[in-house]
């Protein structure tokens, strides 16, 4: 089966700088700007395993011995989901939960995939969530962060002043073969304004969404947002 095709991984090349860690830091943290705040990346470490996100697939590789050994591989998207028009380019790990963040141009939103890695390094699919969002891509930054068991990510929404404004508000739904209704995650009391002058053609709702990660297949999310011009810089600290 495709999910067990670990043998198809013939060669893995990883480049980057070495990051010194203390015994108190999470083993999964391999890419940070701020201590204690993990960033989305394509290579993570969990115990003796390297977890690699590459070309729409997740690979687990045993690295605790004298040689690398492919263990398991799985699609970075759920069963029945077409990867066409989608980019899966960010991965984080909380406990034994692997989170893959992607953007689908075909479905028009952010995809959040939840996977599980067991003690033997085998990968299992759990669930996928679809969040309303415009493209968050930045050549200088990742969109997601992880602090403990809280997933935090940024997503912009262009505000349509001449149509249904509810479609401009952040909302989440669980992926199913027959898509269900979106659940709004941004209350009106959590929308703020910058005070900067802007016109209706450059009005963006910059939302920061926080989701609680657990060993279950569910994802509980809530959002805050700032209304202002399209330009932005995204930064997350451990205590603010």
Q: Where in this protein do the model-derived segments appear?
A:
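Beta-sheet-rich non-transmembrane sensory/scaffold domains
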Residues: 1-240
């Amino acid at each position: 089966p495709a999910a067990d095709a670990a043998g198809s991984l013939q060669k893995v090349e990883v480049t980057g700088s070495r990051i010194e860690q203390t015994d108190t830091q999470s083993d999964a943290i391999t890419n940070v700007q701020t201590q204690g705040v993990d960033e989305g990346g394509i290579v993570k470490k969990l115990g003796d395993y390297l977890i690699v996100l590459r070309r729409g697939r997740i690979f687990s590789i045993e690295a605790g011995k004298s040689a690398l050994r492919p263990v398991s591989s799985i699609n970075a998207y759920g069963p029945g989901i077409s990867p066409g028009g989608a980019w899966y380019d960010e991965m984080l790990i909380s406990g034994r939960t692997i989170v893959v963040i992607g953007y689908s141009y075909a479905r028009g939103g952010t995809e959040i995939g939840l996977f599980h890695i067991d003690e033997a390094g085998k990968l299992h699919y759990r669930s996928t969530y679809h969040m309303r969002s415009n493209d968050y891509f930045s050549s200088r930054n990742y969109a997601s962060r992880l602090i403990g068991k809280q997933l935090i990510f940024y997503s912009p929404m262009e505000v349509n002043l001449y149509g249904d404004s509810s479609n401009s508000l952040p909302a989440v739904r669980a992926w199913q073969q027959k898509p269900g209704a979106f659940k709004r995650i941004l209350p009106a009391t959590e929308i703020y304004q910058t005070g900067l002058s802007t016109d209706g053609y450059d009005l963006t709702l910059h939302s920061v969404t926080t989701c609680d990660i657990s060993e279950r297949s569910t994802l509980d999310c809530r959002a805050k947002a700032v209304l202002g011009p399209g330009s932005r810089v995204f930064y997350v600290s451990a205590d603010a």
